[in-house]
Design a protein with these regions (language model features):
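Conserved binding/catalytic microenvironments
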Residues: 107-411
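Short amphipathic recognition helices of helix-turn-helix/homeodomain-type DNA-binding modules
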Residues: 1-15, 27-30, 38-106, 392-398
Length: 411
């Protein structure tokens, strides 16, 4: 995405606004002022919704939308909410059918099938953080069907069967994550159960550890913090070094949400002592220092230790800001952790930071970001008279259309 093109789009938006104030324009198009401000400075690409509203208001004939589309032309095509809803429903139905068929059948697949599946898992893992979830679902879903079909129709004595089951489990795990971040937690749990069956069937420690971590995440976002912490601790039994820091981080964030200062700090110490993986493994991105700072600062802020948290969360945001390939979900969550730390010092800055996080996922709806943003907006409710807080709360009254797949709450 060219910086020159983004600057030209920003300049054109400023030109159209003319002497009209940003607040007045926001009221006229029923959008929030902070998004308009960032669009005019070129710090982020304006959302499709914003440019469509501006085009309609200024009667440009779609000029801004075309400029924006030119800038994102190299990205994967978007999937409409209705198409994605049908796709998700079909995949979920297939999960139930294929589970019944596993361990039966006759046909034997070729090694080329296995290499294709392994390549897909690796490619999706490597691009997961910078690709909209809606674009990944069809790719992962297609290969998951292939993998599960092979496993379900399989050749019990074939020596490649365990490898196919691991690949099928990795793809089911990826679908679990994708369903979760489109707001479908029930579908996410369905695929996680299937991934867990493959993990148990193969005894693969990497898949087993990853599945455990995702169960902790589902419990955490459901508000069951005690179970989230318990599951994360249980994951250590696999002794899988790649996930040691991640599982400790999941325990820390859950205990922080419970207000358990001693337990949370002990878990953070374990996280910081754990090895940092040098490269990603199939289906799971590696723990990183920036992500560790996000967890540490966010946990301290949950415990009310805002001054201590602030430089840590600021460091995490800076680390992601300076990466051209920063994973957008983690980048946005770093901003949300920083917002939580700012609650003790500057409510306006805290609200604006949440809005920046939402801007980052405006065209890539991500449930983890919207859920945390909703939580922070609720915490800021006593300050609803502050303009930035009022704008944020107004923005969160309606979840993005592409997240409205299930009844997942955002506030």
């Amino acid at each position: 995405m060219g910086q020159d093109g983004r600057a030209e789009l920003a300049a054109r938006i400023r030109e159209l606004r003319g002497d009209k104030g940003q607040a007045a324009l926001a009221a006229a198009i029923l959008h929030d002022r902070t998004a308009i401000s960032r669009a005019e400075t070129g710090t982020v690409l304006p959302s499709r919704d914003l440019v469509e509203r501006l085009d309609a208001y200024y009667r440009t004939g779609g000029e801004l939308g075309r400029r924006r589309q030119t800038l994102i032309g190299g990205q994967l095509p978007e999937v409409s909410p209705s198409d994605r809803r049908d796709l998700l429903a079909g995949l979920a139905a297939s999960a139930g059918e294929l589970t019944v068929r596993i361990r039966t059948g006759r046909t034997t697949p070729g090694r080329s099938d296995l290499l294709l599946l392994q390549h897909t898992v690796r490619t999706v893992t490597d691009t997961y953080g910078v690709t909209p979830h809606s674009a990944l679902i069809p790719v992962v879903g297609r290969h998951w069907r292939l993998a599960e079909g092979i496993v379900a129709d399989a050749w019990k004595s074939d020596r490649l069967r365990p490898a196919f089951r691991v690949a099928a489990g990795q793809l089911a795990y990826l679908l679990c994550r994708l369903f979760f971040n489109t707001g479908d937690t029930a579908g996410s749990a369905t695929f996680l159960e299937l991934a867990e069956e493959h993990a148990v069937g193969t005894g693969d420690p990497a898949l087993s550890s990853a599945v455990t971590g995702m169960w902790s995440t589902l419990h955490f976002y459901a508000g069951d913090y005690r179970e989230a912490a318990t599951v994360a601790v249980d994951g250590r039994r696999w002794g899988y070094a790649y996930d040691t820091a991640v599982l400790a981080a999941y325990e820390a964030r859950a205990l922080g949400a419970l207000g358990d200062d001693t337990g949370a700090m002990r878990a953070l110490e374990l996280m910081e002592r754990s090895p940092i993986p040098s490269a990603s493994e199939p289906s799971c991105e590696p723990y990183s220092t920036a992500w560790g700072m996000l967890i540490a600062g966010g946990t301290l802020a949950r415990l009310g230790r805002h001054e201590e948290a602030l430089p840590i969360t600021a460091g995490s945001v800076t680390a992601y800001d300076t990466r051209s390939d920063a994973p957008y979900e983690m980048h946005a969550n770093a901003l949300l952790a920083h917002s939580r730390a700012l609650l003790g010092a500057d409510i306006t800055a805290a609200a604006d930071t949440v809005s920046r996080a939402l801007d980052m996922v405006a065209d890539r709806p991500t449930y983890s970001v919207w859920a945390r943003a909703g939580e922070l907006a609720s915490v800021m409710a006593p300050h609803r008279s502050v303009q930035a807080v009022a704008e944020l709360r107004g923005r969160l009254r309606e979840a993005p259309a592409m997240l409205a797949l299930t009844a997942g709450q955002t506030s």
